[in-house]
Amino acid sequence: WLAHFAADVAAAAREVGFDGFHLDQYGYPKAAVRPDGEIVDVAASFDTLIRGVREAVPDATLVFNNVNDFPTWSSPSAPQDAVYIEPWEPVTTYEALARVATRARLVGGGKPVVLAAYQSIYDKAARDVGDASTRLTMATLFSHGATQLLAGEDGHLLVDPYYVRNMPAEDETLDMLASWYDFLVANDEILVDPGIVD
């Protein structure tokens, strides 16, 4: 299966021109048993997957989605370009986001840490409330050495894990995001330097 999948990924890179890949997973089950009763180490199987794809596309950008922080304790050592985490319950507070970001930096081997902390608040509340929540989320992540996957194409925001379900941002929100991203770039030596730890 892995050889077939890796060959398909390499073909996509070669024939379609993709220069990067996001390897996804469901997050569950975290344990598996084969029909013959053999227990499968799911975390180790993801490591094998990442390594197999990296061999097939050595020059592509490659990230693996650690859904709900699984298996962040092992996957960052695999040959990928960032530690990417999609947090779900019980990661529902800024404190919990900070813990996830800090832990990812500790095991990340100097790789950038990116969290897909979707701002679904924009679906439920006025823009100013969504912007306030986004500022708090970005402050939490930036101050713990991580960034947030939020800004999409054509001024849209990712508000849901199903990326095609995104939301156009108002001009005020885009201006706010630009100022925060400018701040991150201007201060990256102290915010996301992998050598700085809590």
Predicted regions and their residues:
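Active-site-proximal substrate-binding groove within the catalytic cores of carbohydrate-active enzymes
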Residues: 49-50, 57, 64, 74-80, ...
